[in-house]
Amino acid sequence: MTAARGRTRIVTVARWPAALALVSWRYLWRTTPLHRREEPGSVADLPDSLDEGDRLHPARQGLGAGVGPLLHRCYAVRIAGSSMSPAELIEIVAANLNRASPEMAVFAKTRGAEGVLAVGDEFVVRMPGPWDGPVQVVRRDPTSFCFATLHGHLEAGQIEFRAAADGDGLRFEIESWARAGDRLSDLLYNRLRLAKEIQLNMWTHVCVRAAALAGGRPVGGVTVRTRSLDWPPSRDTLS
């Protein structure tokens, strides 16, 4: 780790009290039920491509560049009462990510046109906790888009946002495959679990906001499944 990057990490840690206070406040006033499940992972939890986006950016920070276990997380909400199609919902979310994100997180676009989301666009996610970091859009289709982390992010991996029809409603999901970006991040995320809770609060908020942006309401709360896989995967895991 360079001296400059080390100083950045120290500043990030210093900002944690405010982030944790906000997370605690949200938990106290949460009205949408949250259903959490944690379980051991398997080779089935690996993303379809471990190298998603490598050809787009030489500074891609893939899973192999990370530290600690792979965490495969999926946040999902069923939306009732919306007249939108899955593509219409994703278009609204993608056009302005800050409409769906909590106020503690700001998506600052550093490459690409405003108001649209295309492959190759880049953002820096600004947060008062351990989430400041650059990302790039590596996949975009009518009902989904995917970010990959770039060098300097506190995680190494990728995250996908998608919507689909679910009976007479919609289903909005956020799925991530990530490892800590360095040893300090591994400590704060996997050992102390502080960053993990901030992340959970952020993405469950996005799920609830997606329901509102769709003109509907969450049904049954938000489900969060976390599967942890040691890295590199063992032969037993791969068998």
Locate each region found by the language model:
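Beta-strand/loop substructures that line and gate deep hydrophobic ligand-binding cavities in soluble
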Residues: 152-197
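A conserved amphipathic terminal alpha-helix motif
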Residues: 184-235
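Hydrophobic ligand-binding cavity/cleft-lining segments
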Residues: 2-126, 233-239
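Beta-strand-enriched cores of mature, soluble protein domains
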Residues: 131-133, 138-139, 149, 180-182, ...
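Short, flexible segments with low predicted structural confidence
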Residues: 60-64, 134-135, 174, 178
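Hydrophobic-ligand binding "helix-grip"
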Residues: 126-167, 238
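Short, intrinsically disordered, mixed-charge
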Residues: 91-99, 152, 165-168, 208, ...
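Beta-strand secondary-structure signal
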Residues: 74-76, 124, 146, 160-162, ...
